[in-house]
From Swiss-Prot:
The keyword Cell cycle applies. The keyword rRNA-binding does not apply. It is a multi-pass membrane protein. One of its GO terms (biological process) is intracellular monoatomic ion homeostasis. It is found in: Cell membrane; Secreted, Cell wall. It comes from the Eukaryota. This is Protein FYV5. The lineage of its organism: Eukaryota, Fungi, Dikarya, Ascomycota, Saccharomycotina. Signal peptide: none annotated. The gene is FYV5. GO terms for cellular component: cytosol; extracellular region; plasma membrane. Involved in maintaining an adequate ionic strength homeostasis of the cellular aqueous environment, necessary for normal growth rate. Required for survival upon exposure to K1 killer toxin and hence plays a role in cell wall glucan synthesis. Required for dithiothreitol (DTT) resistance. Involved in cell cycle progression.
Length: 152
């Protein structure tokens, strides 16, 4: 399950950081609903796997996924009041820790706001792994979120 969660983190963050500027309301609501559905389904699956010894790993990966998906929705919906309200309402039904969620929001805001985004690439990071500085930042970001998820 932790491998599927890591793959979901890559896919979700990649698509939520694409700068949709025309209709952020519809897209942010769709991604928020997608994160809520995934959050609910993984919660059910993790409860059935509590007897296994690696349930802690899957639970930590699930917290990282929840934080990243909701943070991506909030960052994407920051241009619209409807999207941000939906994202915050869905956060109340999530199981991720608020500190981890806030950390993911700040990391996403840093990547989307302060780092330069080339026009020929659709997203600020995860498509820029061939550049050394972004590879280092991606590695540090994922390492931080994994360690934070294991200790929360």
């Amino acid at each position: 399950m932790q491998y599927h969660s890591a793959l979901y983190v890559y896919i979700y963050v990649t698509f939520t950081t694409i700068p949709y500027k025309e209709k952020p309301d519809i897209i942010s609501i769709c991604f928020s609903m997608l994160s809520f559905v995934f959050d609910f389904s993984v919660r059910i699956c993790s409860r059935t796997l509590e007897s296994f010894s690696w349930s802690l790993i899957s639970s930590s990966a699930f917290k990282v996924v929840s934080a990243f998906s909701l943070a991506g929705s909030c960052v994407l919906a920051s241009r619209s009041s409807v999207g941000i309200i939906v994202s915050l309402l869905l956060f109340n039904f999530s199981t991720c820790n608020f500190v981890l969620f806030l950390s993911a929001v700040l990391i996403d805001l840093f990547f989307c706001t302060f780092l330069p985004t080339p026009t020929f690439l659709p997203t600020p990071f995860f498509f820029m792994l061939h550049l050394p500085i972004f590879s280092l930042l991606n590695a540090l970001e994922l390492l931080y979120l994994i360690i934070a998820g294991l200790h929360i």
